[in-house]
Design a protein with these regions (language model features):
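Short, compositionally biased "basic patch" segments
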Residues: 61-91, 145, 149-155
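Acidic/polar active-site rim loop that often engages polyanionic ligands
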Residues: 39-42, 61, 77-79, 160-164
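Metal-dependent phosphoesterase signature
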Residues: 77-111
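C-terminal cap/substrate-recognition subdomain and adjoining C-terminal extension
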Residues: 1-16, 22, 96-97, 103-165
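Generic structural "secondary-structure junction" signal
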Residues: 35-36, 87, 157, 165
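Active-site neighborhood of HAD-like aspartate-dependent phosphohydrolases
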Residues: 10-70
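Short, flexible active-site loop motifs that bind/organize anionic cofactors or intermediates
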Residues: 29, 84, 128
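A generic alpha-helix surface/boundary motif
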Residues: 37-41, 76-77, 92, 96, ...
């Protein structure tokens, strides 16, 4: 679910002032923050961005398997191939496609999330989405939820605004 610090950390800067930190709350995406996995939604986003034109053979089966048992070595290998698919494609197009599907992900958020977010905010903890999903895909979703930060896979982008693969 979430990991957070229950203790307050103290740091004494060089000027003698004392800072306090209440930690942070980290939430994973698939089958934690979301009721299922995000793969099917992001596959649709990739098609919207022009990274693929149609579902690959066995796609529905793979997404169903991931929703049921989680990450496996084959599914991780498939995810690694996404960077190859992204090579030469526009970061802006991927971000725009992710923005178009973000509300579908918001609809999948677990019922506990609002109360958990409020508890952490009240305690002064920033809320962070932590996922291996590419940043450009999850950032619009995190923004919709009002999260404070995102820790995610980042693809390099060339000067022309396209992924370098």
């Amino acid at each position: 679910m979430s990991a957070s610090s229950n203790s307050t950390a103290f740091h004494e800067p060089a000027d003698g002032a004392v800072e306090t930190h209440n930690g942070a709350a980290f939430f994973d995406l698939d089958r934690t923050l979301l009721a299922g996995a995000s793969g099917e939604v992001f596959a649709d986003a990739m098609r919207l961005a022009g990274l693929s034109s149609k579902p690959f053979p066995g796609e529905k089966l793979l997404f169903g398997l991931f929703n049921t048992i989680g990450e496996t070595l084959p599914s991780m290998a498939l995810a690694r191939q996404a960077v190859t698919l992204a090579k030469g494609h526009s970061q802006a197009a991927v971000s725009a496609a992710a923005d178009q599907v973000a509300d579908r992900l918001v609809a999948m958020v677990q019922p506990f999330a609002d109360a958990a977010f409020e508890m952490h905010r009240t305690a002064g903890r920033p809320i962070v989405l932590a996922t291996t999903t590419p940043y450009d895909l999850v950032k619009p979703f995190a923004d919709r939820l009002g999260l404070d930060d995102v820790v995610a896979t980042r693809y390099r982008v060339r000067e022309d605004g396209n992924y370098d693969g």
